[in-house]
Amino acid sequence: MSSPFDLTGHVALVTGGNSGIGLGFADGLAAHGATVVIWGTNADKNRAAATALREHGGEVVEMICDVGDQAAVVAATAEVAGRFGRIDSCFVNAGVPGRAPSFVGMTDDEWHRVLRVNLDGAFYTAQESVKQMVAQGTGGSIVFTSSGSAYFGQQRGQHYGASKAGLISMSKAIAVEHARHGVRSNAIVAGWTESDMTSPALRTDAFGAKVLPRVPLRRWGEGRDFAGIAVYLASNASSYHTGDVITIDGGYYSF
């Protein structure tokens, strides 16, 4: 009997796939036989991630793409579809942090710097992938990386929280509208996870002493903690799973 998690022949796109949660997604997908395409804006990090992913024996493609640039997303998606003829799953993961001096002191430029990547970029990426999934006639799986900031107030981070809340709403709307085309869409709410974006804060004694005791599993998340959910949501095992918000946080938001 074949495994429901066998991704042989599956083409997966992971934005921000060169580190952190995105690399965790990509590693799980590659380990289960998928062809993996990673997008990122840092060529060296892309190259290093692709080299590591190729150790699983499958095809890995690295591409420079700034998801906040709509024309770049359109071109990069067309390149992926042209090369492989399909996109079976798209992990809308690329994002940037946001921390303003204060809410009233937040500038228009700072607001749009975060929304440009986290929300506009997610829209461009998901829209192009859904177009391809509908056109190929087989549907596919869209997965958004959200955050607890979508639910809980983050001081000086109103722009970041708004962007992550928007992803949940976008995901649910895609799930409802495009189910008839076989497109599923789900969002993942990630807890405190080691990454280039978060590690400087997580590794300080003061932050660890304040926050880590509130994580029931008593550790920070790692990219590898997101490998399994990526495989599940990409595979046929999740064929009846859409419109959901899945929390992976070590129990933090339950405490």
Spans of features found by a protein language model:
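Short C-terminal tail/terminal secondary-structure segment
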Residues: 2-4, 97-100, 152, 217, ...
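Residue(s) in the substrate-gating loop at a strand-loop-helix junction
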Residues: 147
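Short, small/polar-rich loop/turn modules that mediate ligand/substrate recognition or access, typified
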Residues: 179, 184, 241-243
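The beta1-alpha1 cofactor-binding region of Rossmann-like NAD(H)/NADP(H)-dependent oxidoreductases
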Residues: 43, 64-76, 108, 225
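Active-site helix of classical SDR
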Residues: 126, 163, 171
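Substrate-binding pocket helix/loop in short-chain dehydrogenase/reductase
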Residues: 101-103, 107-115, 211
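Conserved glycine-rich cofactor-binding loop
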Residues: 11, 18-19, 42
